[in-house]
Structures are given as structure tokens and as C-alpha cells.
């Protein structure tokens, strides 16, 4: 287990948070630990129908405590630290031949070869909180897929490729956004980097910081929640009306919240704007954009690596790359995790883990 000497194991933010050399906390499984975790996931794949079935959603956090103890210790401690932008677990085995080709679309990405790995990601997530999905994103799947789609190379969603995916808080528009975003790399032959950045506190003057803590900013839903990016069967769902309302009439929010020395961040580089006519807010947002652009760093997830990005402390994106469309493209499984599922209770689409935007 690798831990920074500057970690803080406490619930309250420190008066000042030292920045470690590496802005994420990393753990490497031994071969025996990796085999044990994979075997546990394989048993789940045999026992349960699907990762988002109600029985497995309830059982996963309990089964997760059968994962190797050293891994559980790392996750329990790292999630309390004040500084890491992400928790990274390396060393999970992926049988590339058994995995099969990278699908051409997320609709066909629930493949037999990737099924045990989806269960593995769910088990890891169970050590951090409860998973959920969006009714307006990839047809309400809890485990979603990140892969390039032909024709979408220059879009503003994760299925883009030739265009860089801009930095963002995941689902920044919603008060029910994830606390963690989990990514499991099934395949990344070209070493395409995930980008991350935290709050550039050292470079923000006091007045700009004051403004960013005030509800003077508008954040609209990103394009992944649009009807056009979901199946035709989803077109009439009432949840899309809520997305349209959030896009047309967003409520002013603060970009920074919480402890001033270790604030939580809520921003989307492509979908955030100042309130109309608010020049001071526009200047503050412009300053923040420039500082985040300048502080972006890269995290490459190799095959089998898992990252849990702290969606409260860091924004993330992805570098541009040349898609192959030959069955060997970059492919990740993705999941949303909340520390408090009841926070979003009124947005549940029925008795499920799928959120609708009311």
C-alpha cells in the first residue's frame, strides 16, 4: 500500500492541506489479492442476474467485505484523507481474449466478457458508498460504458475521441451528483490519459474566492442527458422534461462550498456560466477556468486499473485521441457513488437506484 506522508485521517478539514507530490492515493494488489478479488466477482456474476438488479444492489456492500483485507483497509483510510483527488487500485487481471472486442456503442456493451469486471467495480464501490444511475443517461444503467462511438468524435460527451473531453464535475448541474466517480479500465492500448485538477486555492485572491462561494453561477446539464443520446424507447420519459427545465431555467448555485481551506468544487468547463449581467461572477469564473486549465495533470489508467475520482474535490476530463474502430479501442466501465443515498430520495425513479430529474 502506498500512502502519502501528508495524509490526514480525520473527519474535519485541516486548517491547511499540504499537497502531496502525487495528487492521488494509490494501492497495488498482490497477485494473490487480485486473484481473490476476481474470483469473488466471478461468483457474483454467476449468482446474480445483473449488476443493477435489486438483490445485488442490496448485497454488494456486504459482499465487498470479503475483498482482501489490505485493500479494504486502504479504501477505508484513503476516503477520510483530506487531499487525494482520486483513489487508484492497480493490478486487477483482465483476460484480453476473454474480454472480446470493444463494442461499437454503449448499447451493446453488456458483454459476457466484461460482465465479471462490472461486478468487480460494483464490489469496490461498495467500500465507498451506494451506487446509482440516471434515468436520462445510457437508458438508466447503473454501470455505464465509456468508449468511442463513430460519428461522435467531436461531441461534448465521453463517447468523443478526437476532441478533448473538457474538465468537469460529474453531473455538476444536480444537487444529487455523485461523491465519487468510479472508472475501471478494460482496455487502453494507446495510454489515453484522464485529466484531473483540484481547487487552485493558492492562486485565488480573497475576493475571487468570496465570489465563488456565492450563489451567482448557472450550471446546465451536459449533453449525455439529452434524449438524442439515449435509446428511442426512452424518448417519451418524463425525466427528460426535468433535464430540459434544468437547461432552460437553471437555479443560481455556488461553485465552491464547505470549508474555506478545503472546499468542495462544483463546476463544468463547458456548461457553467455566470448569472446574467453579473460581471464580477464572470470574472471570477474566468479566473478559475484559467487556473484549472493551467493545473490539469494526467492519470493514465492501464488495463485493469480502477480509479475512484473524488467528485467533490476534483474535476476530470480526458485527452483527445485517435479512435481505432477496430475492436481495440479504449473502453472503461463507469459508476456513480454517493455517501448518502437518502439525499436523493425524492429524485428516485420509482423504488430503484435510478434517479429522475423532477
Curated annotation (Swiss-Prot):
<dbReference type="GO" id="GO:0005506">
    <property type="term" value="F:iron ion binding"/>
</dbReference>
<feature type="region of interest" description="Disordered">
    <location>
        <begin position="1"/>
        <end position="21"/>
    </location>
</feature>
<feature type="transmembrane region" description="Helical">
    <location>
        <begin position="117"/>
        <end position="135"/>
    </location>
</feature>
<dbReference type="InterPro" id="IPR014503">
    <property type="entry name" value="Clavaminate_syn-like"/>
</dbReference>
<keyword id="KW-0045">Antibiotic biosynthesis</keyword>
<dbReference type="GO" id="GO:0016020">
    <property type="term" value="C:membrane"/>
</dbReference>
<keyword id="KW-0560">Oxidoreductase</keyword>
<keyword id="KW-0472">Membrane</keyword>
<dbReference type="Pfam" id="PF02668">
    <property type="entry name" value="TauD"/>
</dbReference>
<keyword id="KW-0408">Iron</keyword>
<dbReference type="GO" id="GO:0017000">
    <property type="term" value="P:antibiotic biosynthetic process"/>
</dbReference>
<dbReference type="GO" id="GO:0102525">
    <property type="term" value="F:2-oxoglutarate, L-arginine oxygenase (succinate-forming) activity"/>
</dbReference>
<feature type="binding site">
    <location>
        <position position="330"/>
    </location>
    <ligand>
        <name>2-oxoglutarate</name>
    </ligand>
</feature>
<comment type="pathway">
    <text>Antibiotic biosynthesis.</text>
</comment>
<comment type="function">
    <text>Involved in the biosynthesis of capreomycidine, an unusual amino acid used by non-ribosomal peptide synthases (NRPS) to make the tuberactinomycin class of peptide antibiotics such as viomycin and capreomycin. Catalyzes the stereospecific hydroxylation of the C3 of (2S)-arginine to generate (3S)-hydroxy-(2S)-arginine. Usually clavaminic acid synthase-like oxygenases catalyze the formation of threo diastereomers, however VioC produces the erythro diastereomer of beta-carbon-hydroxylated L-arginine.</text>
</comment>
<feature type="binding site">
    <location>
        <position position="316"/>
    </location>
    <ligand>
        <name>Fe cation</name>
    </ligand>
</feature>
<feature type="binding site">
    <location>
        <begin position="268"/>
        <end position="270"/>
    </location>
    <ligand>
        <name>L-arginine</name>
    </ligand>
</feature>
<protein>
    <recommendedName>
        <fullName>Alpha-ketoglutarate-dependent L-arginine hydroxylase</fullName>
        <ecNumber>1.14.11.41</ecNumber>
    </recommendedName>
</protein>
<dbReference type="InterPro" id="IPR023966">
    <property type="entry name" value="Arginine_beta-hydroxylase"/>
</dbReference>
<dbReference type="InterPro" id="IPR003819">
    <property type="entry name" value="TauD/TfdA-like"/>
</dbReference>
<feature type="binding site">
    <location>
        <position position="334"/>
    </location>
    <ligand>
        <name>2-oxoglutarate</name>
    </ligand>
</feature>
<dbReference type="InterPro" id="IPR053447">
    <property type="entry name" value="Alpha-KG_dependent_hydroxylase"/>
</dbReference>
<dbReference type="GO" id="GO:0016706">
    <property type="term" value="F:2-oxoglutarate-dependent dioxygenase activity"/>
</dbReference>
<feature type="binding site">
    <location>
        <position position="168"/>
    </location>
    <ligand>
        <name>Fe cation</name>
    </ligand>
</feature>
<comment type="similarity">
    <text>Belongs to the clavaminate synthase family.</text>
</comment>
<keyword id="KW-0479">Metal-binding</keyword>
<dbReference type="InterPro" id="IPR042098">
    <property type="entry name" value="TauD-like_sf"/>
</dbReference>
<feature type="binding site">
    <location>
        <position position="170"/>
    </location>
    <ligand>
        <name>Fe cation</name>
    </ligand>
</feature>
<feature type="binding site">
    <location>
        <begin position="156"/>
        <end position="158"/>
    </location>
    <ligand>
        <name>L-arginine</name>
    </ligand>
</feature>
<keyword id="KW-0812">Transmembrane</keyword>
<feature type="binding site">
    <location>
        <position position="194"/>
    </location>
    <ligand>
        <name>2-oxoglutarate</name>
    </ligand>
</feature>
<feature type="binding site">
    <location>
        <position position="334"/>
    </location>
    <ligand>
        <name>L-arginine</name>
    </ligand>
</feature>
<keyword id="KW-1133">Transmembrane helix</keyword>
Amino acid at each position: 500500500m502506498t500512502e502519502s506522508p501528508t495524509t490526514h485521517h480525520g473527519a474535519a478539514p485541516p486548517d491547511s492541506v499540504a499537497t502531496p507530490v502525487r495528487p492521488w492515493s494509490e494501492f497495488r494488489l498482490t497477485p494473490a489479492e487480485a486473484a481473490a478479488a476476481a474470483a469473488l466477482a466471478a461468483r457474483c456474476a454467476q449468482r446474480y442476474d445483473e449488476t443493477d438488479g435489486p438483490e445485488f444492489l442490496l448485497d454488494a456492500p456486504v459482499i465487498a467485505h470479503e475483498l482482501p483485507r489490505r485493500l479494504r483497509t486502504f479504501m477505508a483510510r484513503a476516503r477520510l484523507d483530506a487531499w487525494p483527488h482520486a483513489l487508484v487500485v492497480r493490478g486487477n487481471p483482465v483476460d484480453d481474449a476473454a474480454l472480446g472486442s470493444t463494442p461499437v456503442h454503449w448499447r451493446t456493451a453488456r458483454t459476457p466478457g466484461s460482465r465479471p469486471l462490472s461486478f468487480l467495480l460494483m464490489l469496490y464501490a461498495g467500500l465507498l458508498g451506494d451506487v446509482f444511475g440516471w434515468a436520462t443517461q445510457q437508458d438508466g444503467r447503473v454501470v455505464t460504458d465509456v468508449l468511442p462511438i463513430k460519428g461522435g468524435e467531436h461531441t461534448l460527451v465521453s463517447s468523443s475521441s478526437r476532441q478533448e473531453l473538457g474538465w468537469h464535475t460529474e453531473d455538476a448541474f444536480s444537487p444529487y451528483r455523485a461523491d465519487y466517480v468510479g472508472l475501471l479500465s478494460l482496455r487502453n492500448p494507446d495510454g489515453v490519459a484522464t485529466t484531473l485538477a483540484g481547487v487552485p486555492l493558492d492562486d485565488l485572491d480573497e475576493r475571487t474566492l468570496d465570489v465563488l462561494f456565492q450563489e451567482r453561477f448557472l450550471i446546465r446539464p451536459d449533453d449525455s442527458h439529452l434524449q438524442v443520446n439515449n435509446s428511442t424507447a426512452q424518448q417519451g420519459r418524463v425525466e427528460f422534461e426535468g433535464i430540459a427545465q434544468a437547461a432552460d431555467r437553471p437555479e443560481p448555485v455556488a461553485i465552491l462550498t464547505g470549508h474555506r481551506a478545503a472546499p468542495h468544487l462544483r463546476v463544468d468547463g463547458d456548461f457553467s456560466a455566470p448569472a446574467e449581467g453579473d460581471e464580477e461572477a464572470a470574472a471570477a469564473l474566468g479566473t478559475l477556468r484559467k487556473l484549472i486549465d493551467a493545473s490539469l495533470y494526467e492519470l493514465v489508467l492501464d488495463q485493469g486499473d480502477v480509479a475512484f475520482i473524488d467528485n467533490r474535490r476534483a474535476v476530470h476530463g480526458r485527452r483527445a485521441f485517435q479512435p481505432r474502430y477496430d475492436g481495440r479501442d479504449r473502453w472503461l466501465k463507469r459508476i456513480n457513488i454517493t455517501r448518502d443515498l437518502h439525499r436523493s430520495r425524492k429524485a428516485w425513479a420509482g423504488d430503484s437506484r435510478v434517479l429522475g430529474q423532477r
